[in-house]
Every structure is written in structure tokens, then in C-alpha cells.
UniProtKB/Swiss-Prot annotation:
Keywords: Amino-acid biosynthesis, ATP-binding, Cytoplasm, Kinase, Nucleotide-binding, Proline biosynthesis, Transferase. It comes from Bifidobacterium adolescentis (strain ATCC 15703 / DSM 20083 / NCTC 11814 / E194a). SMART domains: PUA. Substrate binds at S62, D149, N161. It is an enzyme of class 2 (transferase). GO terms for cellular component: cytosol. This is Glutamate 5-kinase. ATP binds at K22, T181, D182, T223, G224, G225, M226, V227, T228, K229. Its EC number is 2.7.2.11. Residues 285-359 form the PUA domain. It catalyses: L-glutamate + ATP = L-glutamyl 5-phosphate + ADP. Signal peptide: none annotated. Its main location: cytoplasm. It comes from the Bacteria.
Length: 377
């Protein structure tokens, strides 16, 4: 696709019918770590304005742990996983009570959805999330989504909801993603460093990720840094969704398409949510190693992975699981949904379709990974 201008991207955001807004913990809390009602109410006012103008808004909100740790007697955000989960269990209710009261002042209802990584990995849960969100939006509610911090572990997380927000944007077929943080824009280096310059527009976020120096950790009340926000913008851009990154106080202007923060252009036409799920949400359970010919065909982007071109199977997986497709040097080429169990595949390796049909039966005369279920990485 042709790269749009900054004006075109801002206009697309202003005209968006469905917007996903992500807000981090540090944008909702006081320095002490407690929820800041003024910040939360200001965000709600900005969202309510869009909603009352006929737009549809999904809010992905962090803040459960930040809302709960003070109530449970902690001076700061705990680092122990069990303590964090306890704080989230208490804080999520406090957070939603604040949101419910704030939106009610505008005559708007909210619906809470708590999600873990597994809810976007398993196809059935993924479809359930999509159906629930679509229905809430159709009924005029504002869905409020958070990672289920009381169940999630540090080993498998979205990253302060940043990646989650980009996946949700694709699930609801959003027209724009707004990432709210505690800095007003993306900079060429940490804003406190001399010579750091604000970046108002990123035509290709993948190029920017390689060039822009970003901090790797978040604030003392959040878990995400600028890296996860850039990754979220990349997921959105790859799936054809424009994005803007700015501070929470700029939420209203950002959704109106005003020149605040940093705008990110989409770098692909909108893809299917299924392919985005394969590429970004699914967690590979094993690896298929392709020979040089099969690797070349996979890189071409239009070929299925056939048993004749696979030389090794790694891992334990079932049909329908996500797997890596690697070359013989160990480089990841693609992710895909495999059509056979790992125990079935060894007997298939090196055989062409006719041989598979003859020696193993008709049910084996199919690609290991069909091209429709294969996403290059």
C-alpha cells in the first residue's frame, strides 16, 4: 500500500467509527500509587464525548494493581507475584466502581471483560471475546478490558495491556488505536536527555523501532515501557490500523485527530483477524524445520508447507496448534497452524502428496501447514 501522509492518518483517526483506547497505570494514579479521580474523570469525559457523537469506544485500562496495593497496606507496588495478584483482585473492583460512576454521569453503561493470554491463544476463547465485544458495542455500552492480573503470571503476560490493546483493535475491526501513557509523544531518545527530539509522525513503525532509543521499563506503578507501546503500534500498523501515542491529558484531542503526540501510519492494508491472531497472539508449541527448497517457497509467501519439504519436527503439539517454521539454520521464517499432531508427522516427512495418499491414506495427503494458516515473521 502507498504510505499515507500525516494529515491523512490524523484525518482517518478523526473519522474513526470504532476506536480502541489504551491507558496505563501511571496515567490513572497519583504519585502515591492511589487512583487519581481527576485523571480518571478527565479520560472518561474525553471518551464520553466521542461516544455521544456516535462513535464506538473500547477502553483497555490498566490500574487494578495500582488501585489495590495501597488499600492492602503496601507502600508501593509489590514485586511478589502472589502479592500483585491479591492487589489486582481488590483493585479491579475499585477501578471499575470509579469507571461505572464516571460514565454514568454521561448516561453511559460499561461492561467489564478480564482477559488472559490464553483467551487470545485458544481459537474458541478468541471467538468468544469477539462475540462479547461486538454485542456490548451494539448495545451501546463501553467495554472496559484489563488483563486478568489476579490470574496472570509474570511468565506469560501481554505487557501492561499494550499488546492486548492492539489485538483488541483488530478483533473489533477498529478504525484507530490510541495509546495513552505518561509522556506526550515518542522521542528520538528519552525526553530528559539533551538533544532528544519529539517525533510527530512515524510512516513505518518497523523502521522506527530500529532507530529510536526507548526505555525498557515502565514506571513504578506500571509494567510496560515505551518498547511495548511501540510493539503495540507495530501490531496495529501491520494489521492496517492507524495509531497515535500521547499522554492521557491529550486523549480528547488525539481522538479528534488533532496534531498531538505521535501518529503511526498503517503499513499494510487491513488483514484478517485470523491471520493477526496467528502472527501475534498465538504461542508456538513446536517447530517444523524446512529444507532449503521449502524455506524458499515459504519466504515467497504463497506456498503451503508440505511434508516433502520438512526435515525435522520439534516439540509436542496437537493438530490446530501454532508452530514455528524454521530453516535449517534455525531462523524463524513463519508461524502457522499445523494440520497434524506431532506424533503423526515423522512418518510423513520426505513424502510427496501421492506417496502420502498411497502409503498412509487420503487423510494424510494434505499440507502440514496450509498457506491460509501461515504468516511470515
Amino acid at each position: 500500500m502507498n504510505t499515507p501522509s500525516q494529515a491523512q492518518v490524523r484525518r482517518a483517526i478523526a473519522e474513526a467509527q470504532t476506536i480502541v483506547v489504551k491507558v496505563g497505570s501511571s496515567s490513572l494514579t497519583e504519585p502515591s500509587g492511589h487512583l487519581d479521580p481527576q485523571r480518571l474523570n478527565a479520560l472518561v469525559a474525553a471518551i464520553a464525548r466521542v461516544r455521544l457523537m456516535g462513535g464506538r469506544v473500547v477502553l483497555v485500562s490498566s490500574g487494578a494493581i495500582a488501585a489495590g496495593f495501597g488499600t492492602l497496606g503496601f507502600d508501593k507496588r509489590p514485586t511478589d507475584v502472589a502479592d500483585q495478584q491479591a492487589c489486582a483482585a481488590v483493585g479491579q473492583g475499585l477501578l471499575m466502581a470509579q469507571y461505572e460512576a464516571a460514565f454514568a454521569r454521561y448516561g453511559l453503561r460499561v461492561g467489564q471483560i478480564l482477559i488472559t493470554v490464553s483467551d487470545t491463544i485458544a481459537p474458541q476463547q478468541y471467538r468468544n471475546v469477539r462475540r462479547t465485544l461486538d454485542r456490548l458495542l451494539d448495545l451501546g455500552a463501553v467495554p472496559i478490558i484489563n488483563e486478568n492480573d489476579s490470574l496472570a503470571s509474570n511468565e506469560i503476560r501481554f505487557g501492561d495491556n499494550d499488546r492486548l490493546s492492539a489485538l483488541i483493535a483488530n478483533i473489533v475491526v477498529a478504525d484507530a488505536l490510541v495509546l495513552l501513557t505518561d509522556v506526550d509523544a515518542l522521542y528520538t531518545a528519552p525526553p530528559s536527555e539533551p538533544g532528544s527530539k519529539r517525533i510527530s509522525y512515524v510512516p513505518n513503525v518497523e523502521d522506527a523501532l530500529a532507530k529510536v532509543q526507548v526505555g525498557g521499563t515502565g514506571s513504578n506503578v506500571g509494567t510496560g515501557g515505551m518498547v511495548t507501546k511501540m510493539e503495540a503500534a507495530r501490531v496495529a500498523a501491520v494489521s492496517g490500523i492507524p495509531a497515535v501515542l500521547t499522554c492521557a491529558s491529550n486523549a480528547g484531542p488525539a481522538m479528534m485527530g488533532d496534531p498531538v503526540g505521535t501518529a503511526f501510519a498503517p503499513i499494510n492494508d487491513r488483514g484478517s483477524s485470523r491471520r493477526l491472531w496467528i502472527g501475534f497472539a498465538s504461542h508456538p508449541q513446536g517447530t517444523l524445520v524446512a529444507d532449503s527448497g521449502a524455506a524458499k517457497a515459504v519466504r515467497g509467501g504463497a506456498a503451503s508447507l508440505l511434508a516433502a519439504g520438512v526435515v525435522e519436527v520439534k516439540g509436542d503439539f496437537a493438530a490446530g496448534d501454532a508452530v514455528w517454521v524454521d530453516d535449517e539454520q534455525g531462523n524463524h521464517l513463519a508461524k502457522g497452524l499445523v494440520g497434524f499432531d506431532s506424533e503423526e508427522i515423522p512418518q510423513m516427512l520426505g513424502r510427496n502428496t501421492a506417496q502420502l495418499k498411497r502409503f498412509l491414506g487420503e487423510e494424510y495427503a494434505h499440507p502440514l501447514v496450509h498457506r491460509d494458516n501461515l504468516v511470515l515473521v
